[in-house]
């Protein structure tokens, strides 16, 4: 005869499964490297495969991805709901790998916010159909003294808020609103900045030519006016 199943009350061990554990990416990577070294000593796996994987885990790329992932994950407000935790994890993953596409690895740069400003200028934005870039590092300013930013860095986020595809003013407002310090996620793409600056220079040159032509036309009209008055 079948006995009815009985569901036991949650135990302390089961309850711990719902506790949100902090990220331990540094420790996890270190543990993975340690296990790879033990496997290498055992000789069970070809050494060249283990060395390749170990090289990836110790690379600057992996470190950069880990830093961006952890930063994005920690700056997203997450409550106890598993759905929100999943969204935060997904958003952090997308931010890390999307930032690394193309030219260079993403970097997290933290600068102190003082009365003298942050020491750099930005250009570009959605209204100019371009990303937002660090266009100038002010000599002697905070950014130059810190040494973390480069001219040609694309600005990806400010204090956890993405500025990709945003207007120029949005990035400026976020930078101004930061207090005490500002955390930036950037990636170095100088060629794109050079192309953007070249495009802006062409627009400025075309605008100057139009202004010069307009000025010449006005001068010609002014010269013709006295002659017409004299003839009349």
Swiss-Prot record:
Molecular function terms, GO-annotated: L27 domain binding; PDZ domain binding; protein-macromolecule adaptor activity
Compartments, as annotated in UniProt: Cell membrane; Basolateral cell membrane; Cell junction; Postsynaptic density membrane
Domain L27: 25-80
Induction: Up-regulated by cell depolarization and calcium entry through L-type calcium channels.
Keyword Acyltransferase assigned: no
A GO CC annotation given for this chain: membrane
GO biological process terms on file: exocytosis; inner ear development; neurotransmitter secretion; protein transport; regulation of synaptic assembly at neuromuscular junction; synaptic vesicle transport
PROSITE patterns in the cross-refs: L27 (PS51022), PDZ (PS50106)
Predominant location: membrane
InterPro entries in the cross-refs: L27_C, L27_dom, L27_dom_sf, LIN7, MAM_complex_regulator, PDZ, PDZ_sf
Protein family membership: Belongs to the lin-7 family.
Entry text on domains: The kinase interacting site is required for proper delivery of ERBB2 to the basolateral membrane.
Identification of the protein by name: Protein lin-7 homolog A
Source taxonomy: Eukaryota, Metazoa, Chordata, Craniata, Vertebrata
């Amino acid at each position: 005869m079948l006995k009815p199943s009985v569901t036991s009350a949650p135990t302390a061990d089961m309850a711990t499964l719902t506790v949100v554990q902090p990220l331990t990416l540094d420790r996890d990577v270190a543990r993975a490297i340690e296990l790879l070294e033990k496997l290498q000593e055992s000789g069970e796996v070809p050494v060249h495969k283990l060395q390749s994987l170990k090289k990836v885990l110790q690379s600057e790329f992996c470190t950069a991805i880990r830093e961006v992932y952890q930063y994005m994950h920690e700056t997203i407000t997450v409550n106890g709901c598993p759905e929100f935790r999943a969204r935060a994890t997904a958003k952090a993953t997308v931010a890390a790998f999307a930032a690394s596409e193309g030219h260079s690895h993403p970097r997290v740069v933290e600068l102190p916010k003082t009365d003298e400003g942050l020491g750099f200028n930005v250009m570009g934005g959605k209204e100019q159909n371009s990303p937002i870039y660090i266009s100038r590092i002010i000599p002697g300013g905070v950014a130059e003294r810190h040494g973390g930013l480069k001219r040609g860095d694309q600005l990806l986020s400010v204090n956890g808020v993405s500025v990709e595809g945003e207007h120029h003013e949005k990035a400026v407002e976020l930078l101004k609103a930061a207090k005490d310090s500002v955390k930036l996620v950037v990636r170095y793409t100088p060629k794109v900045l050079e192309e953007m600056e070249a495009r802006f220079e062409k627009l400025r040159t075309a605008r100057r030519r139009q202004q010069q032509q307009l000025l010449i036309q006005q001068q010609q009209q002014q010269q013709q006016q006295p002659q017409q008055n004299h003839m009349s």
